[in-house]
Amino acid sequence: MNTVRVDHAKLWLAGEARNWELAAYQLAQMKELLSAARKLMPTYRQLPIGQMDNTTMEMLAGPLAELEKMIDAKDLGNFSVAYDKLTEACNSCHETAHIGFIVIRRPVGSTFTSQDFEPRKQRGTAPK
């Protein structure tokens, strides 16, 4: 799940930079990892990760779909709102799984100093 947290942070940084191509990629990565976690880790420290109930998955499905729409629309204002809803859903899921001490939030700055989150100006142009 730590990898999901990394994608969650990179999703914010990409959206904030209006790099919609990267934001779409990070969102797809998150969705893929959440799906894989259910299959690959049926339990983690006695928590039924692989048996997340429909309510838990619905908690995430709505915000994920809303984020996808905002990315497609390139709508930064509503992207921020949708991102915060996803973050709330992540924290609600943690509460449900009895790990509410893991609190996710918007990143404050970037720890990914080797990655440029600004969109490329044109195809084929090397990043700064």
Model-derived segments and their meaning:
Residues 1-128:
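Sequence context surrounding c-type heme c attachment/ligation sites in exported
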